[in-house]
């Protein structure tokens, strides 16, 4: 498999803490001793980030899944915000929608936002939303892969021209509460809507994967990215 293009730039996860804990933006040290909700695998980005901040993710905090969030059809954002409000967790690691629900509801505040530089600089390139496919698909159906890249780029451009389109699409996939928020979530992130995959990202992602024990070695940019489609970015 190879990465074909980016859906957006940077690690798209936020650390949201209970509002009554009064943790300041960027104060990672204040997270010590807290119970933090995070989905399996997704938690790896948080663990690596905490290590960069000098916090032991196994000894200094308790990171575990939020009960009820792994059930199909359940909204992570709504469930996580409710768990935060009920005091079942002290903080959670979520994408933009999950964070927005908690902040808008008044139960949470953002502490870490790697995409905007609130966190270790290296964490920006730990992960990134991408379109990936198999080498077989690339070899046998390159026109289909190219069409998918063009479609992604067109959507990114369309969102920048008219962010209200996000609400129209959101109605088909999100509960009413999230649908009402999606346009403002997308609008805030429009500067990151770029299909390019950079060598800096691949270098950072490789280092992250090695640190997390997910791989060994240091594959090159060409080993990781299907560069024949880069002219479409």
What are these regions, as identified by a protein language model?
Residues 209-233:
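Conserved C-terminal helix/tail region of periplasmic/extracytoplasmic solute-binding proteins
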Residues 51, 56-58, 108, 176-178, ...:
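Short coil/loop linkers at secondary-structure junctions
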Residues 139-216:
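Secondary-structure end/capping motifs
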Residues 1-76, 90-96:
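Short, glycine-/small- and polar/acidic-enriched structural segments
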Residues 72-172:
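Pocket-lining segment of extracytoplasmic ligand-binding domains
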Residues 30, 49, 101, 169, ...:
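Residues within well-ordered alpha helices
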């Amino acid at each position: 498999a190879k990465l074909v293009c980016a859906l957006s730039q940077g690690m798209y996860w936020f650390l949201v803490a209970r509002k009554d804990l009064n943790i300041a933006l960027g104060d990672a040290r204040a997270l010590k001793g807290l119970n933090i909700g995070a989905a399996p695998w997704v938690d790896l980005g948080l663990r690596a980030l905490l290590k960069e901040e000098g916090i032991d993710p196994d000894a200094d905090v308790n990171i575990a899944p939020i009960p009820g969030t792994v059930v199909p059809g359940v909204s992570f954002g709504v469930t996580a915000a409710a768990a935060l409000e009920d005091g079942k967790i002290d903080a959670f690691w979520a994408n933009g929608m999950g964070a927005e629900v908690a902040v808008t509801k008044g139960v949470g505040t953002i502490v870490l936002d790697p995409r905007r530089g609130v966190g270790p600089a290296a964490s920006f390139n730990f992960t990134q939303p991408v379109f990936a496919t198999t080498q077989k698909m690339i070899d046998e159906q390159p026109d289909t892969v190219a069409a998918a890249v063009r479609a992604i780029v067109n959507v990114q451009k369309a969102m920048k021209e008219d962010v209200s389109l996000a609400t129209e699409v959101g109605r088909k996939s999100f509960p009413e509460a999230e649908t009402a928020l999606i346009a403002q979530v997308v609008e805030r992130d429009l500067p990151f809507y770029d299909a390019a995959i950079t060598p800096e990202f691949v270098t950072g992602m490789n280092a992250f994967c090695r640190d997390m024990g997910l791989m060994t070695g240091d594959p090159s940019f060409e080993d990781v990215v299907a560069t024949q489609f880069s002219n479409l970015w």
